[in-house]
Regions:
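Bacterial Sec-dependent N-terminal signal peptides
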Residues: 1-28
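Long, intrinsically disordered, low-complexity segments
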Residues: 18-19, 114-117, 193-195, 233, ...
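Membrane-proximal, proline-rich intrinsically disordered regions
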Residues: 19-68, 250, 414-416, 629, ...
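Conserved, well-structured interaction surfaces
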Residues: 44-62, 81-161, 177-216, 221, ...
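Short coil/turn linking the two alpha-helices of tandem helical-hairpin repeats
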Residues: 158-159, 163-165, 231-243, 513-516
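Short coil/linker segments at helix-helix boundaries
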Residues: 164-184, 239-269
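Flexible, polar/acidic helix-loop-strand segments at domain edges
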Residues: 342-343, 352-353, 359-499
Length: 646
């Protein structure tokens, strides 16, 4: 039997490893790799092994939800809690080189073993021809799927670490020391290789899944083309395109890993990829989700728009939700829904099936637009009437707000007169929550989040650290059970890795960067805004913005700012925020020494509760843009270079 060695630094000393080192993931305890390809069934299981390394996009343990400022969690925490692992260490500036958190290079501390994944993909591609009597079209599809996975796993590593070794083939155990001690490759070469794999994969992937219910999550042409678009956008973005911070970052032969010269053609190439992906998605029947009330609903137009936003993510019936291009079934949403749901009423306080701990900070709440569809700091009404200056002061809800805020109750001025996506994404003290057993706009749950109230702080670990909750992630058909310690019936849904709104906004971004403002740029932003109940970009700023900002959509810089904010709003709470701010090279500006804020949740009365408190002050320097490689890996492979600053 031929033996294999992955091209990975950490294995550089393991020259005498036996073949059994490589069989840990072979299905059904098959004795050898070759035996995994003696029948269609065992080969298919090996295909699914290649899929099994897919990162769990809905997991707060494996993702970037709390590394930056998308969510806060209680800190310090009680012992033996279930959400106090690596991401929290990174978010508070405690990443290290001895044992890095979220280590996808080695598959440790919350990270999956991506290089092992690439090795298994290579094994599959080399051995699949040995499967007897395998249908030719099925074999082509399987090969295309594995090439897609191979591209995606490379992309995941590239996005995290910058330059990486390219695992094009597995080396035999007889490989020399020099062959095994691989080098990181320039980032442009890495992007080119990933795109070439995606191009190869596309030809033999299906446009639609033949069996949606049993094949959900498997690669298709729309998925591959959408990933290609995102890869090329990443390559064109400031972190990788003309980044002078890494001017002196070179390999041992003096070859630079980054080209310090900005290349506008990368944006043009990304725009073409986005256009192609959108055309494919259109032909495959994808469209922006819009909620259709059912017979049990009693809701008005604004709540219907809210449900369109919420269900664009949380709808689990993909015959209804045609917006999700790629849904990851490797990790369903049940756990993150549990962490997002507040205690809706006093009768549920003994129910431990929900945890109310994922808390968007004040920084995120302020990001959403006013009801006019412009930033609150640029809204002429907010500025001229003093609403922005006094946004933390109390205001009493009148009947005008009765479907979003409990009439007669007080909350911060900040929570009034906001766009629908604000109320669809976030919940807060005295906010109304539609669904989870209540489907009448006149009888919604009232969130009461002050100390001593159902959704207020209790204990060391079960509370919102900021006073905000994440409404969008909780399916509205969930059901909390009274008097049942674990009684939370959750309607699970596959996590939406890519949805159509994401692609539309990417296309707008690439067009603006490549060519500047145009009707085509506005078109794709406005489609997303229209679904959110907002006027188009140009009219919104001309009608509602302060005089100095009315022409903002007319300039490339102004429109860039609008598109970036639109992406952060539309994709809020879905795990994109950290990666987006990073690729724009805005992380130092937005996070370094800028406090993460929330309400004073220790208070039982409205006045002191709505005092702004600092949760913590993150430190983000240039070195934090890329993950460190573990020191041990560098010691066994002298050809590897550590990322700058670590």
């Amino acid at each position: 039997m031929k033996k294999y060695r992955i091209i990975l630094a950490v294995l550089a000393l393991a020259f005498s490893a036996s073949c059994t080192d490589y069989l840990e993931v072979v299905p059904d305890n098959i004795a050898t790799i070759d035996n995994a390809f003696t029948s269609r069934n065992t080969a298919e299981k090996f295909l699914f092994t290649c899929y099994s390394y897919m990162t769990s996009h809905a997991s707060v343990y494996e993702q970037a939800f709390t590394i930056a400022d998308e969510f806060m969690v209680p800190y310090p925490q009680a012992t033996n809690t279930f959400y106090n692992d690596p991401y929290e260490i990174i978010g508070r500036g405690n990443q290290n080189v001895v044992d890095p958190s979220l280590n996808y290079w080695d598959g440790a501390k919350g990270g999956k073993a991506m290089f092992q994944a690439l090795r298994d993909c290579n094994i599959f591609l080399e051995k699949v021809d040995n499967v007897p009597a395998l249908d030719v079209s099925e074999k082509k599809r399987w090969i295309a799927e594995v090439k897609f996975l191979k591209a995606y796993y490379h992309y995941w590593l590239l996005r995290m670490y910058g330059p990486i070794p390219l695992i094009k083939v597995n080396l035999p155990v007889s490989a020399s020391v020099e062959e095994v001690q691989v080098k990181r490759q320039p980032v442009d070469d890495c992007f080119d290789y990933i795109v070439s794999l995606l191009d190869e994969a596309c030809a033999d992937l299906p446009v639609k899944l033949p069996k949606l219910t049993t094949e959900m999550g498997r690669a298709t042409q729309p998925i591959a083309l959408s990933v290609k678009a995102k890869v090329l956008v990443e390559a064109a973005s400031p972190l990788f395109n003309g980044n002078e911070d890494y001017l002196n970052f070179k390999d041992n032969d003096g070859i630079p890993y980054f080209n310090p010269t900005k290349d506008l053609a990368k944006w043009e190439k990304a725009a073409t990829a986005c256009k192609t992906a959108i055309a494919m998605c259109d032909s495959a029947g994808f469209k922006l989700y819009k909620y259709s009330p059912n017979s049990n609903d009693r809701i008005n137009d604004e709540l219907t728009v809210q449900m369109s936003i919420r269900n664009s993510v949380a709808e689990n019936n993909f015959n209804l939700n045609k917006e999700v291009i790629w849904a990851n079934t490797n990790n369903l949403s049940g756990h993150i829904q549990m962490l997002s749901t507040p205690t809706l009423d006093a009768k549920f306080t003994s129910n431990e099936g929900h945890r109310l701990v994922l808390a968007p900070p004040l920084n995120v709440a302020e990001m959403f637009y006013s009801s006019h569809g412009v930033p609150i700091e640029e809204d002429e009404e907010w500025v001229s009437m003093g609403k922005y200056t006094n946004r933390y002061r109390l205001k009493t809800a009148t009947s005008e707000y009765k479907y979003n805020i409990k009439e007669g109750e007080q909350t911060a001025t900040l929570n009034f007169d906001r766009e629908v996506r604000f109320y669809a994404n976030l919940s807060f003290d005295r906010n109304l929550w539609y669904g989870i057993g209540k489907y009448d706009m006149e009888d919604q749950w009232v969130i009461r989040a002050r100390v001593g109230e159902p959704a207020g702080k209790r204990g060391m670990s079960l509370y919102s650290a900021t006073g905000y909750f994440c409404k969008k992630l909780a399916n509205y058909q969930n059901n909390l059970l009274e008097g049942n310690a674990a009684g939370y019936i959750i309607v699970d849904y596959p996590w939406p890795v890519i949805r159509l709104a994401d692609l539309y906004l990417l296309y707008s971004e690439t067009l603006n960067e490549a060519y500047g403002p145009s009707s085509e740029v506005y078109k794709w932003i406005d489609l997303v805004r229209e679904r959110a109940g907002l006027e188009d970009v140009q009219n919104s700023w001309k009608k509602y913005a302060i005089p100095s900002r009315k022409s903002k959509p007319d300039t490339q810089d102004g429109l860039r700012e609008i598109i970036q904010r639109e992406r952060l709003i539309e994709l809020a709470n879905e795990g994109h925020r950290y990666w987006e701010i990073r690729r724009w090279k805005k992380a130092k500006e937005m996070w370094h020494n800028r406090p993460i804020l929330g309400w004073d949740i220790e208070q039982s009365e409205a006045e002191p509760y709505y005092r702004v408190k600092t949760i913590f002050t993150p430190q983000f320097t240039t070195k934090n843009y890329f993950w460190p490689i573990k020191e041990y890996d560098l010691s066994v492979n002298p050809n590897l270079d550590q990322n700058p600053g670590w």
